[in-house]
Amino acid sequence: MVLRALFLLHPAQTLAWNAWTIHPSTVIGLTVLGWLYFRRARSAEGIGPSTGQRVAFSAGLLLLFVILNGPLHDLSDFYLFSGHMVQHLIMELIVPPLLIAGTPGWMLRPALRWPVVRWLAPRITTGPMAFAIFNVTLCFWHLPALYNLALLHHNVHIVQHLTFLIASVLMWWPLMSPLPELPRLSFPGQMLYCFVMTLPMSVVAIYIAMADTVLYPLYASSPRLWGISPKMDQLIGGLIMWIPGGLFFYGVMTVVFFRWQRQGNGGDSVAEAQGSRGSFAAAGD
């Protein structure tokens, strides 16, 4: 009852699809990230990011801005758990590949001169560690007490989204690393990595979808949209995490498979092949 009373203190009472609530924390964070990227790009002499890389990075920042402000943000925070799952999947599965694809390796390499980064980066970007960090973060924040805490306190919600984003970038690193010093998994390793990545997310999703009770009661206190009950909303949210989330990784596996075949036919560069790790298991050595 206390949680419900606190939730009712939130200002949103009606959802306006054309309303944009701009959050300063989001604007500041994205502005700083964009400034650092384009400042570094301008300082490069003849080796700046390609047009495609600039577009990819900018698209990642723009997508983050869209999902963390405006109608989807309000839908996620005040009305529907299923809306929050859409927001989180975009943050975890679409934004990080855009940011990584848009960042050339030379732009990141100077950070490896810092002793802490040089020591830490090779340890947290291996397949097993990236897998563990992402899935521990996923499970941690979907515990009902912590999830509800993030909904009630904006600063906690900021921490939740930051940890999701960082963990997701790490999760994608063994598949997309632009740095030979922190190489990708081999193609077979990438396929295995994508497969096992579906398992913890599926377990969490099935638990949420099949729960007998409403795990996140704050949504039960919000105005109902489109006649969706809190229990049905939770079921839909679990299915969104389970089915699109799982299918996404199978889609990535398909892309990796065809890239692997291209390498066998001489279509991929030797440098990329040399930059791959031997296997998913070997990545932890």
Task: For each feature predicted by the language model, list its residue ranges.
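Alpha-helical membrane segments of multi-pass proteins
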Residues: M1-D285
